[in-house]
Amino acid sequence: MTRIRLEYHGHVAYITLDHPPANTWTLASLQAFLQMMVELDSRPDVVALVIRGAGDKFFCAGADLKMFADGNVEHAREVAEAFGRAFEALARFHGVSIAAINGFAMGGGLEVALACDIRIAEQQALLGLPEASVGLLPCAGGTQRLTELVGPGWAKRMILCGEKVSATLAYEMGLVEEVVTEGH
């Protein structure tokens, strides 16, 4: 079970990340996400896509680190490539893509949001790229997209130091376009 859902409401599609407790990415969910993006690209009637996390604490905490526990370099490479393919497909989506960040958006969670056209964060959200703290680097275009949005100074702080930012600071630095109250 991939624990990722695609639903349609009129001309809007919703992808919900639902992998408790933290809505993490697995290889299977990345592959399912890519297939959903292929399906969405075949639907010209879909003009908008909202990506959201199930629950109220996590938008997406990034990769499920259990995938890397055995130290298999080939598997890590396969996962990194899957991240890249999935989020590049999102970045190329023909409609408007919106990340509805309802909680923690870490690592691959922030990277999926960065691939969206618009990012809206609830006020309790916390955003970051903590990969460096576990010996990794963002692998899905996040380094480039983050730098484009916030400039090299903030990008380096977040990428190299793993600095996390609140929704308010993310708005002030241009990482998100709007901050809303919880549940909106």
Regions flagged by a language model, labelled:
Residues 53-88, 135:
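Glycine- (often His-adjacent) and acidic-residue-rich active-site loop
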Residues 1-52, 88:
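Conserved CoA-thioester-binding segment of acyl-CoA-metabolizing enzymes
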Residues 62, 80, 84, 107, ...:
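Glycine-rich phosphate-binding loop at the start of an alpha helix
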Residues 86, 90, 100, 106-159, ...:
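CoA-thioester-processing core
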Residues 15, 51, 64, 112-114, ...:
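Hydrophobic/aromatic residues within transmembrane alpha-helices
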Residues 1-17, 163-184:
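Amphipathic alpha-helical segments at domain termini/boundaries
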Residues 20, 55-57, 103-104:
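Short glycine-rich anion-binding loops that position phosphate/pyrophosphate groups of nucleotides
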